[in-house]
């Protein structure tokens, strides 16, 4: 049995069964990355076209590596060298490229809703690699994979997300995903970084970081999204780090088996101290590693795969 949806647009488009299928498939995919030859012919003859309208390191490279590990051809379109610089719309660009018969489109865009718009107008699967402040489903899935891998479960755990919640698509997707899989979530941030309508998220909210940390099984730190804010939302960076940053001293109040996560890029010394980011509780690099496995699973499943692709 495959996914119940053609497109991966947000966590709302995935059922609990879909999420479990992705995570189970990703575990099989991770084994491929541990082999001496990290490649299988599963998607040979398939083509992935990627559009990244925002800067990206981990996500862009991860999708590219994922496609190539499954033997798919991966083509990344540079906006700067495309006809969009001549006035062509994104929709026209994609519809023209669709006639070249790609098998899946991956898109990151600064405007919320763009992947949904494309999905309505093209006949191939669309994977959202992040749209504005709205959603980042593959990030939430890799985060859930990492927690499940380290804790053996997601259900019943407590996730604390600390930082710029208002402007974070990662926060929104993780809240929805973890709640759907039976975890509880607490959001901690200054009032200027809590979104309007947060009461609809289904998560607890506090402005006290130490309170959020104390009961958490998993702590996810978020950077300040300066590129999405009209002005800095705290008095000074130093004051923000002192009040909301995760330090070794603050971590003493956490559970002894707590996991520390960060979607990256990390601003060391601001939202998280270097010794915490590099410390024994950190699974930040595990998240990066699992990102490849999750995106391999997504490519495989949206192209019609049912489960095991390890051969």
Curated annotation (Swiss-Prot):
Pathway: Pyrimidine metabolism; UMP biosynthesis via de novo pathway; (S)-dihydroorotate from bicarbonate: step 2/3. PROSITE patterns: CARBAMOYLTRANSFERASE. The keyword Cytoplasm does not apply. Coiled coil: none annotated. One of its GO terms (molecular function) is aspartate carbamoyltransferase activity. It catalyses: carbamoyl phosphate + L-aspartate = N-carbamoyl-L-aspartate + phosphate + H(+). Signal peptide: none annotated. L-aspartate binds at residues 86, 169, 223. GO terms for cellular component: cytosol. GO terms for biological process: 'de novo' pyrimidine nucleobase biosynthetic process; 'de novo' UMP biosynthetic process; amino acid metabolic process. The keyword Transferase applies. Carbamoyl phosphate binds at residues 58-59, 108, 136, 139, 264-265. Keywords: Pyrimidine biosynthesis, Transferase. Its EC number is 2.1.3.2. Pfam families: OTCace, OTCace_N. Heterododecamer (2C3:3R2) of six catalytic PyrB chains organized as two trimers (C3), and six regulatory PyrI chains organized as three dimers (R2). Belongs to the aspartate/ornithine carbamoyltransferase superfamily. ATCase family. Catalyzes the condensation of carbamoyl phosphate and aspartate to form carbamoyl aspartate and inorganic phosphate, the committed step in the de novo pyrimidine nucleotide biosynthesis pathway. This is Aspartate carbamoyltransferase catalytic subunit. It comes from Desulfosudis oleivorans (strain DSM 6200 / JCM 39069 / Hxd3) (Desulfococcus oleovorans).
